[in-house]
Amino acid sequence: MKEIKEAYQQCGQIVGEYAPACFKALSYLPLKQRQASWAVLSFCHTAASADEKVLPAFEAKADHVYQRTNNGKQHLWKAFDHAYRTFTLESEPFREFIAAQKEDAKPYDDLDELLMYAYRTGGAAGLMLLPILTRRKQDQLKQAAVSLGLAIQLVRFLSDLGTDQQKNRIPRQVMQQFGYTEADLQKGTVNKAFTMTWEYIAFEAEAYLEECQDALPLFPQYSQKTVKAALHLHRAVLEKIRAKQHDVFQYHFALTETEVKQILSDI
């Protein structure tokens, strides 16, 4: 068990580095659920970070976990295998998440393409975590889990548009609707047209956060505070971006430790 504990700790460190808001929200869970959540989100981060040459090997290792034939020695596979067995997780959202990493890097035409990407990544992550967050009412809470994950993915997207990959995901039809040009995008221009484009997408993220908020009473006591914290923290990221005039090309927006403590003290 010492090896498993160390494997979980390694996963926790990864989540703390790449998704500090989620890490803070997960801190309210009981230890078993918290550790399993670290393993799941570490899986997501590793898959999302893998280049196309490495992804097939990653996918093959994941298949061994699904089939209960894992013998991986790395901390991720030890922790993920243990979490997968302990909480009887299903393979489908993990497969969906990996498949989403293989998509072409072409620019998105419309909002539906961005929402589908967010569903296949963030929404899938929500479904991965659902059996960890609740043993009962999973059918009733399925949409809430998807909505939370989808919203978080959109917030992460909206908080850092500095890379070519992220710029490609801004729906071109939405840009055209508000008069934001391709030249503006490539220069990282923040003007009224960009602000309206950003807010159009942010409205979707906030609507999904609200959907999850409505279902909050259905979550068990042990996970309610985690879900509530995630909702508040990701709303706060959007508000911070607004306060800084939407300059998401130059800066990656994240909450400071002081801001996180203040937000969590109010929930």
Curated annotation (Swiss-Prot):
UniProt catalytic activity: (2E,6E)-farnesyl diphosphate + H2O = (2E,6E)-farnesol + diphosphate
GO molecular function, one term: 15-cis-phytoene synthase activity
Activity: how regulated: Diphosphate release from FPP is inhibited by zaragozic acid.
Disruption phenotype: Loss of biofilm formation. Loss of a dark-orange pigment from cells, alteration of cellular lipid profile. Significant reduction of proteins found in detergent-resistant membrane (DRM) fractions. Decrease in membrane fluidity, about 30% decrease in protein secretion.
InterPro entries: Isoprenoid_synthase_dom_sf, Squ/phyt_synthse
Alphabetic keyword roster: Hydrolase
Mutation effect (D51A): Loss of diphosphate release
EC code: 3.1.7.6
Highest taxon of the lineage: Bacteria
Pfam family, one: SQS_PSY
EC top class named in words: hydrolase
Gene3D superfamilies in the cross-refs: Farnesyl Diphosphate Synthase
Subunit structure: Monomer.
The protein's role, per its UniProt record: A farnesyl diphosphate (FPP) phosphatase. Involved in biofilm formation, its disruption blocks biofilm synthesis which is restored by exogenous farnesol. Releases diphosphate from FPP, was initally suggested to be a squalene synthase. Diphosphate release is higher from FPP than geranyl pyrophosphate (GPP) or geranylgeranyl pyrophosphate (GGPP). Biofilm synthesis is partially restored by exogenous squalene, beta-carotene or retinol. Required for integrity of cell membrane lipid rafts.
Family, similarity comment: Belongs to the phytoene/squalene synthase family.
Protein's name according to its UniProt entry: Farnesyl diphosphate phosphatase YisP
Organism: Bacillus subtilis (strain 168)
Lineage: Bacteria, Bacillati, Bacillota, Bacilli, Bacillales
